[in-house]
Amino acid sequence: MANDKIVIKGAREHNLKNVNLTLPREKFIVMTGLSGSGKSSLAFDTIYADGQRRYVESLSSYARMFLGRMDKPDVDEITGLSPAISIDQKTTSHNPRSTVGTVTEIYDYLRLLYARVGVPHCPVCGRVISQQSVDEMVDAVLKLEEGTKFQVLAPVVRQRKGTQQKELDAARRAGYARVKIDGNMYDLDEEIALEKNIKHTVEIVVDRLAMRRGIRGRLADSLETALALTGGVAEVDVIGGECMPFSQNFACPEHGISISDLSPRLFSFNNPLGACEKCTGLGTFMRVDEERILPNRDLSIREGAVKASGWYYAEGSVAEMYYLGLGKKYGFTLDTPIKEMSTEAVNALLYGTNEEKIEMHRTNEFGSGVYYNTFEGIVENLERRFRETNSEWMKEEIGSFMSGVECPDCHGKRLKPVVLAVTIGGKNISDFCEMSIRDELKFIADNEPNLTEKQKQIGGQIMKEIKNRLQFLQSVGLDYLTLARSAGTLSGGESQRIRLTTQIGSALSGVLYVLDEPSSGLHQRDNDKLIATLKNLRDLGNTVIVVEHDEDTMRSADYIVDVGPGAGVHGGEIVAAGSVKDICKAKRSITGDYLSGRKRIEVPQTRRPGNGNFLTVKGARENNLRNIDVKFPLGEFVCVTGISGSGKSSLINEILYKTLACELNGARSRAGKCDGVEGLEFVDKVIGIDQQPIGRTPRSNPATYTGVFNDIRTVFSQTQDAKMRGYGPGRFSFNVRGGRCEACEGNGILQIEMHFLPDVYVPCEVCKGARYNRETLEVKYKEKTISDVLNMTVEEAVVFFANQPKIARKLQTLLDVGLGYVTLGQSATTLSGGEAQRVKLANELARRSTGKTVYILDEPTTGLHMADVHRLIEVLQKLVDAGNTVIVIEHNLDLIKCADHIIDLGPEGGSAGGLIVAEGTPEQVAEVSGSFTGQYLKPLLEKDAKLRAEGK
């Protein structure tokens, strides 16, 4: 029988309840269900994990050492599995060297293209560089001063891993005496042992000379020998001076600038051969930002103008002593506003007095005295401390005053001038990468016909690969991105779709792909392209499993699995599986309720008019925003929409949020480019709620994050038993000595390392997983220990603490945002992005509202089922009903249609975006023909109006 099915038996990972399921192979399958229902546990932690584990275990133990160890999922049996590839939203690289180009591997093809087809120019005069003869090389060397000592080198190995014994033995046999390896000189008579896994540069010393008359012949012979050894490359190493590289291939006759052989490595900013020497290929430096040190120049030093670690003003401090000395020298007092100080004085304050000394008066218990000392400046002081400290806390503290500044040598282009002087069609590799993907495709189409026959023959296949990958990126709605864009700045959805294009480009078949909500961050207009891409992946002969909540994706799937019926302990079952029709018919399926129309998110009957006040961003110019003025009505539910890359995040996260955070919350972040934000007097604080984890260690959990655990510990410390034993709230903390189990240090589990097998996590034998020692667990509140409370779900805890109003109120907010299934002690590292965001939202809801707060949320519906979106909308509407303002970046039409006010940016992404296309109520935006959001919103509003008219 053909193995055309994936059969899962007895899946019990996390909350799955002994699930049995049969899935068709080589089909497009959607797994859906409420947040926390067990979709990801089934798709990622069971199916993918077992497929990946089996593949890895088929490799040798040596190979497995480099691939990491994989846990075996809690499942009886899975048959019909293929090697599995996971494309989730959690693997965005924060490495500053990682870019869209490197992640998609397009940059590798570009390096190859520029090395083979690129035209080298002199970086000084721009002249096309031609071949260099031996005579020209000799002439360049003979310009050295009389008596200058130098040696002629033959670089036989450049930045290559290995012991290089083959080359060293060949040099010995040829009769050479010396060799230069990684900048150090060696005699070939001695034993030379090089580290195998480190890159080395090996240069044979062909001749050693001193500049004098009559050496032309010998020099020419030596250069020819070196060129013969290396295939056309030689170096003249001037003792005590710079190295002079020569090539028979490329050199400028006027300026004598030589380029070593054009190889793909030369175009890599991760390789010392091509990377800018000043910034080592990063393109930026982290420097202390003076705007973060002096954020408000209307203030004086005494009023706290200086906001820098170690330099806050305090009477009698060392900082005051320096400030008084600077004031005496540069003519200001501690009460002079910074803006009224001379430029010279501000520069001295920030960057020091160089060698000039200032007079300082110091008084202490031993008396007073006068000192004369130089002042290094606050900026220089912070940067020195940042370099020298071993304290992670200090690095983080000073790091908050720093921001990236463009490298002055390469101007952010990451490469050496000689590399940037190699062009195709008048553009160097960096220029090409800084264009948007749509412009790159146009550039290739315009310039391909202009290539010579030889260039076409050499670069034809390379250009085809580049075009294919760029077209894949365009097909998933990412044509506004540039290849130079840092991977760390991408959203989860963007990052996932980029890796998706890499997989399609590899054209594998017979693979199991598991994707996590690929429609995240994607405008409805581009969704059809994404679905077509997923079907293309299926048509290559792969099984595509997608964890998704998007209705269009579900309706396009070959097979749907609905996991539920509820979340957490109420989920973990297969409620329905089959076609869309099968799901709609299933009575227990909440997904079916929404797909069939039995339930729906209704459009509000009225839109709020707001309180008449506005926050106005003037002249927004960050990234692709085109000097726009944007008005945000206060006291309303505001939704910012637009095509991916249209400028939503630049406007809201970079400009509005950071400005409000600095002005209202005293944050150190630097806002994006604009002329200012008006209306700050109408709000008193801003709260940004994103999907970043609430903690990075297993010790962080919803109870500790929301602060409810402090109140719970206080309740336990007030019990009769605790008072008799003298236990305070600290006794009930699992993070400090005293009450916790010391065998596992309050973790409850022990990690046992198993070489070449997955690490085993076993419950602590002493506390049996309870986290606390026996004495602490003897204290009970209502017959429950502190450990029992941590194992309660939020739902159970609300009932348990009903007579503790302070605790009950905080827990109720967690319940209100749909997290009733989460346990109080659940590790923060196991929460999804959507769950983490809702914990943060609950934390803010629990605070007393002032009615003048601005809440900013970036795509809060990511990871949420339609029923969860329904509940989220109700929570956000409550915030606005209390007089607050909610501003949301969103693509989900069900949420957008419930907003009071929409600001639609566009019309396209990247350079074709950055304008306001439409604004107003959803009904007003739906009538704007140029708005893509309006086009998709209109039928939705009409359908709702029709149902309302029919009384449904």
Predicted regions, residues:
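Conserved phosphate-binding elements of NTP-dependent enzyme cores
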Residues: 1-952
